[in-house]
Design a protein with these regions (language model features):
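Hydrophobic face of amphipathic alpha-helices that form TPR/SEL1-like repeat modules
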Residues: 78-87, 92, 115-124, 154-162
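Cys/His-coordinated zinc-finger cores
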Residues: 28, 32-45
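Short cysteine-rich clusters marking metal-coordination/redox-active sites
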Residues: 10-13, 25-26, 34, 49-52
Length: 180
């Protein structure tokens, strides 16, 4: 059997998935959906989760589910929980040191989005001591992985570079990989 069509990347649509930043995590089952599909489902009045058919959750229930999945070492849930602490979402107080700890755990579990968030917090000294060398090492490893976050990592490396020629090199690579 030979495939005549390209493999569908998204779980609900035929559009190829963009960078992971365009994915929406469904907390009820920790599955991701592309942002465009999530918006279309909302416009059409489909408020159930397209995967597990769960009813929409309140902020408290969503937080409880996130903590449940994070306790089971779901990398996406740990990263999302870190983002909630960083921004103060779901009724949480902003707690940057807790966000850093959660991002570090998500990085250990292999979440690329957490690498970007942790690297940015380290580079800015947000919730932790400023450590541009560690941030650059995180971004360098992510860039070499050539995943969907590689252009973001190259852009961040360009921002951290002290030499203008190195910065231009990283920004050129980011642009070549689709970062705009």
């Amino acid at each position: 059997y030979k495939e005549t069509r390209p493999r569908v990347a998204g779980p609900l649509c035929y559009e190829p998935w963009g960078p992971e930043s365009m994915r929406v995590l469904k907390v009820c089952c920790t599955k991701a959906i592309c942002q465009a599909c999530d918006v279309q489902l909302e416009i059409r009045g489909h408020d159930l989760c397209p995967f597990c058919r769960c009813e929409p959750l309140s902020a408290a229930d969503e937080l409880a589910k996130l903590e449940h999945w994070a306790a089971k070492d779901s990398a996406a849930a740990v990263c999302q929980l870190g983002s909630c602490y960083r921004r103060g979402d779901l009724g949480l107080d902003i707690d940057a040191p807790r966000a850093v700890a959660l991002y570090e755990r998500a990085v250990e579990l292999g979440d690329a989005k957490a690498v970007v968030h942790l690297g940015l917090m380290l580079a800015e000294g947000d919730g932790c001591p400023k450590d541009e060398a560690r941030a650059a090492a995180l971004f360098e490893a992510l860039s070499k992985a050539k995943g969907p976050w590689a252009p973001w990592a190259e852009n961040a490396l360009g921002r951290l570079a002290t030499n203008p020629h190195d910065a231009a090199k990283h920004w050129r690579r980011a642009a070549d990989d689709g970062f705009s």
